Amino acid sequence: MAEVSRDSEAAERGPEGSSPEAVPGDATIPRVKLLDAIVDTFLQKLVADRSYERFTTCYKHFHQLNPEVTQRIYDKFVAQLQTSIREEISEIKEEGNLEAVLNSLDKIIEEGRERGEPAWRPSGIPEKDLCSVMAPYFLKQQDTLCHQVRKQEAKNQELADAVLAGRRQVEELQQQVRALQQTWQALHREQRELLSVLRAPE
């Protein structure tokens, strides 16, 4: 754990070992670069002082027989190990979309600084915290639903007015049909009366 802590501190100082004070106060290190710096620092620890000595202790007899070959094996082993670790970390970053997530986090933090408002902190009362977070959401949902209800009510009223207008038109047509029917019946009676008069003997 102590080595991890030192690695993080070294990464924050940067690849050249510069301290955070060397960075301007208004500048922040992107978390993607910070992650890369931590990885670089970790990989540098693999070839730190005495790492070769620790390696040779595992193959002491072989090292005594041929130290040059041991050195080449060590160099190749370290290079392949570093490459493998970098590839694994790259795959993890791609699978988890870490670059986009970290950039989004940087953007959120930067926007929070620009607002100048104090960051939200829990009050210690779960009910109060839940209400403070959920109440605005539910109020917004309520406004949206009310707007939809008013819109639907207006649409329903338009449909009701159209139905009433259609009914009035049907009633008017029925009245016209009855009037035409009465007129036709009256005309038919007159024709019958006229025919009966014409057929009557003189």
From Swiss-Prot:
Coiled-coil region(s): 153-194
PANTHER family registered for this protein in UniProt: POLYAMINE-MODULATED FACTOR 1
Organism from which the protein derives: Mus musculus
Gene Ontology MF terms: leucine zipper domain binding; transcription coactivator activity
Principal cellular location given in the protein's record: nucleus
Compositionally biased intervals (Basic and acidic residues): 1-15
Pfam families linked to this entry: Nnf1
Expression induction: By polyamine analogs in M1 myeloid leukemia cells.
UniProt KW Transmembrane helix keyword: no
Protein name: Polyamine-modulated factor 1
Function: Part of the MIS12 complex which is required for normal chromosome alignment and segregation and for kinetochore formation during mitosis. May act as a cotranscription partner of NFE2L2 involved in regulation of polyamine-induced transcription of SSAT.
Keywords: Activator, Cell cycle, Cell division, Centromere, Chromosome, Chromosome partition, Coiled coil, Kinetochore, Mitosis, Nucleus, Transcription, Transcription regulation
GO terms (BP aspect): attachment of spindle microtubules to kinetochore; cell division; chromosome segregation
SUBUNIT field: Component of the MIS12 complex composed of MIS12, DSN1, NSL1 and PMF1. Interacts with COPS7A. Interacts via its coiled-coil domain with the leucine-zipper domain of NFE2L2. The interaction with NFE2L2 is required for the transcriptional regulation of SSAT.
Subcellular location as annotated: Nucleus; Chromosome, Centromere, Kinetochore
GO cellular component, one term: spindle pole
Annotated spans, Disordered: 1-26
